[in-house]
Amino acid sequence: KPHRYRPGTVALRSTELLIRKLPFQREIAQDFKTDLRDIQLAR
């Protein structure tokens, strides 16, 4: 018998992961943009 998660648990875990990732990605995107700008200026 395969182990089954309760539907609520999975939804909660995935949303939690999304919430944790989103601000992080936003920061990375901004850092990435500034890095690109610096690289272009340095050329």
Swiss-Prot record:
Gene3D superfamilies xrefs: Histone, subunit A
Q: Its GO CC terms?
A: nucleosome; nucleus
A single GO molecular function, which one? structural constituent of chromatin
InterPro entries cross-referenced by the UniProt entry: Histone-fold (IPR009072), Histone_H3/CENP-A (IPR000164)
Main localisation, per the record? nucleus
UniProt keyword DNA-binding present: yes
Q: Which UniProt keywords apply?
A: Chromosome, DNA-binding, Nucleosome core, Nucleus
| Family recorded in the similarity comment | Belongs to the histone H3 family.
The identity of this protein, by name, is: Histone H3
